[in-house]
Amino acid sequence: MATQNPNQPVTYPIFTVRWLAVHTLAVPSVFFVGAIAAMQFIQR
């Protein structure tokens, strides 16, 4: 028990394939939602 430090997880790295997949979808999605929301207020 003394050899396992709970503050240093071994099997959970931060930069994983899941992290990459989430951010490649989330970053453009936030950009497009902001762009579409801004377009709603443009008067012709």
From Swiss-Prot:
Cofactor remark from the record: With its partner (PsbE) binds heme. PSII binds additional chlorophylls, carotenoids and specific lipids.
Q: Name one GO biological process term.
A: photosynthetic electron transport chain
**Main location per UniProt?**
membrane
Q: Name one GO cellular component term.
A: plasma membrane-derived thylakoid membrane
**Single GO molecular function:** identical protein binding
Q: How does it sit in the membrane?
A: Single-pass membrane protein
From the record, give the transmembrane residue ranges: 17-41
Q: Which Pfam families match?
A: Cytochrom_B559
Needs which cofactor?
A: heme b
Residues annotated as binding heme are R18, H23
Protein localization:
Cellular thylakoid membrane
Q: Which InterPro entries would you find in this protein's record? A: PSII_cyt_b559_bsu, PSII_cyt_b559_CS, PSII_cyt_b559_N
Q: What is the effect of changing H23L?
A: Complete loss of PSII activity, decreased accumulation of PSII subunits, altered mobility of the PsbE subunit
Q: Which UniProt keywords apply?
A: Electron transport, Heme, Iron, Membrane, Metal-binding, Photosynthesis, Photosystem II, Thylakoid, Transmembrane, Transmembrane helix, Transport
Instruction: Outline what the protein does.
Output: This b-type cytochrome is tightly associated with the reaction center of photosystem II (PSII). PSII is a light-driven water:plastoquinone oxidoreductase that uses light energy to abstract electrons from H(2)O, generating O(2) and a proton gradient subsequently used for ATP formation. It consists of a core antenna complex that captures photons, and an electron transfer chain that converts photonic excitation into a charge separation.
Tell me, how does this one assemble?
Answer: Heterodimer of an alpha subunit and a beta subunit. PSII is composed of 1 copy each of membrane proteins PsbA, PsbB, PsbC, PsbD, PsbE, PsbF, PsbH, PsbI, PsbJ, PsbK, PsbL, PsbM, PsbT, PsbX, PsbY, PsbZ, Psb30/Ycf12, peripheral proteins PsbO, CyanoQ (PsbQ), PsbU, PsbV and a large number of cofactors. It forms dimeric complexes.
Assigned protein family:
Belongs to the PsbE/PsbF family.
Name the chain's protein.
Cytochrome b559 subunit beta
Species of the source = Synechocystis sp. (strain ATCC 27184 / PCC 6803 / Kazusa)
